[in-house]
């Protein structure tokens, strides 16, 4: 075990939204900050496009030690998840969408005081300014946007073009370029048009002296008998185990990463034995639900524009969700169109769940063999021309009743999601069918949901939730871990309920609040 000789005022674990925000705000106060990021640095042009190169595509460390890629896929007992790995965290692969949620979201009793929409608005403002967010230019004629709006109007639902963190018509920062409308936002922007964290919060923190150290996977945290904490981590390239000391620690490893580290610290290494018994509880997938439409009567050109242009808001009609129509570049949409609209028979639906966890090795094998590198020929039932296809993505207020538990060397998520959120799923499916009808096309939910009866979430929340006391959550309203002074959490794991809107704006606003609380105590 090697020990870093440097002593820091703060060690931040993770460089996603919460970590980068924490690093900047602490560095602005003259604090000596080290950020430990497990992934690598990606510059424009570095993001993988060949899915056959699975070690570059997927994060599977330490099971596969050379697989240090961009996407981490998990097939937990209760649902599947997709998260990012790299300097900038989820900002590298999200759809750039920044939405301030409906005030009703904060009426959920799980949100402690002082959190509500008006309290968070100044923090939302900070985030919006730093990311230079703005809607897709209204003058762009985008067939996919036009049709999605028309479907909302036909079904008498409210829609809007959300703020997005992208350089539409002029670069937001030096080193960036303008959007080429290539629909590759969620694959990592190889043109530098996304206003990812490395172009704003991270670069500004670095100017203040903050150090961002990549290839550093944290295993656990322990109190330092002298002062502060010791953070233990491993170099993912060499396997060398190291430690670093600091007065305070900010955990921002993402919902799954932060829960992993705390479960390790409490249950494996026994270094944080007094963590709240609420650890792992209150997990939410933010109601993520995917579907698709084939054979629209109108040409959609789904690869023209950013991934998301418009959001339909179902909240005003009393429903607890929103919907977007994310689409991708032409090669990917062509493959997706060839998969058709799945309608597995009763036998496949019955045995499908038995094979759910096998996807952990089946899917990488499918990628490596190039089976999804080109469209299926002939296409599966319901396959159509990709020009007339779109995806649908609903985000909703699930019951946030998932439970993260320690399983072997990893974690698992226990949750009877489909049973507990049956009404939400039914309402989403009905609304998607209505959109499909408005398109004059054929709608179907994501095949994995029909086969395995499990959703796949790209918006993991909770497990270390904000609360007024340790009987209700893991961190106080300031983001400080109950029972551990100067140990803070700033990421999606602290969010105490589902949001029903794209969550990055709220995760970031709460992180700004936490950073302000930390700085106030310096």
Regions found by a protein language model. Name each.
Residues 344-435:
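C-terminal catalytic lobe of FAD-dependent flavoproteins
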Residues 247-255, 259-380:
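Mid-to-C-terminal "cap/lid" subdomains and adjacent gly/pro-rich loops that border
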Residues 68, 181-185, 220-224, 388-396, ...:
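A glycine-rich dinucleotide-binding beta-alpha-beta segment and adjacent secondary-structure elements
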Residues 10-35:
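N-terminal Rossmann-like FAD-binding beta1-loop-alpha1 element of flavoenzymes
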Residues 1-10, 28-29, 520-522:
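Extreme N-terminal leader/targeting segments of oxidoreductases
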Residues 115-218, 453-456:
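Conserved redox-cofactor binding core of oxidoreductases
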Residues 55-138:
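Redox-cofactor-proximal catalytic regions of oxidoreductases
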Residues 28, 39-50, 207, 220-224, ...:
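Glycine-rich loop(s) and the adjacent beta-strand/alpha-helix scaffold that form part
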């Amino acid at each position: 075990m090697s020990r870093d000789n440097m002593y820091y005022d703060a060690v931040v674990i993770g460089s996603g939204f919460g970590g980068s925000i924490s690093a900047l705000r602490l560095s602005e106060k003259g604090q000596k900050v080290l950020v430990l990021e497990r992934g690598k640095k990606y510059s424009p042009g570095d993001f993988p496009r060949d899915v056959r190169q699975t070690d570059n595509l997927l994060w599977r460390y330490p099971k596969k030690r050379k697989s240090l890629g961009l996407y981490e896929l998990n097939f937990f007992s209760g649902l599947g998840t997709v998260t990012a790995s790299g300097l900038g965290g989820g900002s590298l692969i999200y759809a750039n969408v920044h939405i301030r949620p409906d005030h009703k979201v904060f009426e959920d009793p799980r949100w402690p005081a002082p959190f509500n929409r008006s309290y968070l608005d100044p923090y939302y403002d900070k985030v919006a300014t730093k990311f230079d967010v703005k809607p897709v230019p209204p003058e762009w004629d985008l067939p996919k946007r036009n049709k999605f709006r028309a479907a909302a109007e036909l079904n008498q639902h409210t829609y809007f073009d959300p703020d997005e963190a992208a350089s539409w018509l002029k670069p937001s920062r030096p080193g960036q370029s303008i959007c080429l409308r290539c629909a590759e936002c969620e694959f990592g922007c190889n043109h530098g048009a996304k206003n990812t964290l490395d172009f704003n919060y991270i670069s500004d923190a670095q100017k203040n002296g903050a150090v961002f150290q990549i290839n550093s996977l944290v295993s656990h945290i322990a109190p330092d008998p002298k002062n502060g904490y010791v953070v233990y981590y491993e170099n993912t390239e060499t396997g060398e185990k190291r430690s670093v000391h600091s007065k305070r620690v900010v955990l921002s490893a993402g919902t799954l990463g932060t829960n992993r580290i705390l479960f390790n610290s409490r249950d494996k290494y026994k270094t944080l034995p007094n963590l709240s018994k609420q650890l792992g509880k209150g997990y939410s997938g933010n109601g993520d639900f995917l579907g698709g439409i084939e054979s629209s009567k109108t040409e959609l050109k789904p690869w023209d524009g950013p991934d998301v242009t418009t959001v339909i808001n179902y909240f005003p009609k009393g429903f607890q969700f929103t919907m977007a129509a994310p689409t991708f570049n032409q090669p990917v949409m062509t493959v997706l169109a060839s998969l058709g609209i799945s309608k597995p028979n009763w036998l496949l639906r019955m045995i499908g769940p038995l094979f759910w966890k096998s996807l952990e090795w089946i899917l990488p094998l499918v990628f490596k063999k190039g089976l999804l590198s080109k469209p299926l020929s002939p296409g599966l039932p319901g396959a159509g021309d990709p020009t007339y296809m779109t995806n649908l993505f609903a985000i909703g207020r699930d019951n946030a009743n998932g439970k993260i538990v320690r399983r072997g060397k990893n974690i698992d998520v226990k949750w009877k999601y489909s049973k507990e959120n049956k009404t939400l799923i039914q309402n989403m499916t009905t609304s998607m069918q209505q959109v499909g009808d408005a398109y004059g096309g054929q709608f179907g939910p994501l095949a994995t949901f029909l086969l395995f009866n499990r959703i796949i979430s790209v918006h993991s929340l909770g497990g270390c939730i904000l609360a007024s006391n340790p009987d209700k959550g893991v961190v106080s309203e300031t983001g400080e871990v109950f029972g551990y002074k100067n140990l803070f959490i700033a990421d999606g794991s602290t969010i105490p309920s589902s949001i029903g809107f794209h969550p990055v704006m709220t995760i970031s606003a709460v992180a700004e609040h936490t950073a302000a609380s930390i700085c106030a105590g310096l």
